[in-house]
Amino acid sequence: MKAKLSFTLILIFGILITGCKQKEEHVEVEEVKIDLLNDDFPEAKQEVKQTMDSISKSAQDGDIDKLISFHAYSPKFTEFKDGQPRNDGEENEKYERNVFGSVSEILKFDMNDMKIAVYGQVANVTLHTDFHLKFGEDLVVVNEQMTLLLVKTKNGWRIVHEHHSPLIMEENK
């Protein structure tokens, strides 16, 4: 009889424990698919546009240190210009400090037909320059195709590659 009572108590205790157990919540997490090639990334695109505006302003203000700060110089930094072999970050910084440090006046600093393509943490910016720069009395007009590759860093969007090619302008007929 004692065994039946013990068995019955254990059975009742087991039923109570099982019945009192809270239902576990099952939360489904829907995976968000990101299409790096086709998604527009509008917020990042706006950040890149603001970076480009700041780059332009720093050049026009003659703030060379600020202009240089938009570059992420590292062993990975590269630049192509004037059909010459690839430059590294050190050569790029030296060139930009020399050129923009020698400009006596900026008459025009237009970045035309700008296209910003964002691929997550990387952005490709293509544009046509129409820069009219004075070096003393000499006027230099820079019309070129420019490509800037930017990467999102803890300090914002920074240039990791530059490519400059001549822009062939068609004469008005």
Segment roles from a protein language model:
Residues 21-28, 143-173:
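Short beta-strand edge/turn micro-motifs at domain boundaries
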Residues 71-72, 81-83, 127-131, 163:
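A mature extracytoplasmic/lumenal domain signature
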Residues 20-70:
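Short, low-complexity N-terminal intrinsically disordered segments enriched in polar/charged residues
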